[in-house]
């Protein structure tokens, strides 16, 4: 089975604890839309509570080896478990940052790398 994430939207906590082990209570749900015999789109909503509370909305697609009418629960649980391994790291990067506007005034824009 192949799972591809198409978009991730994260609402980070106001304060992120540093160098601390935290425990989270997590509510989640996944809704699926069957595209064809072995392909589904999904939307997963995760809400974590505790010292490191955050909300995330993930859209993705699944290509299965089997023809399912409905995705089995063990697949949903596996998706959420895998997301929860990565999301806390992403949340720490999803904070606000500041751009000094006067640095860019009257300078040519180059997007080449």
Swiss-Prot record:
It comes from the Archaea. This is Uncharacterized protein MJ0076. It comes from Methanocaldococcus jannaschii (strain ATCC 43067 / DSM 2661 / JAL-1 / JCM 10045 / NBRC 100440).
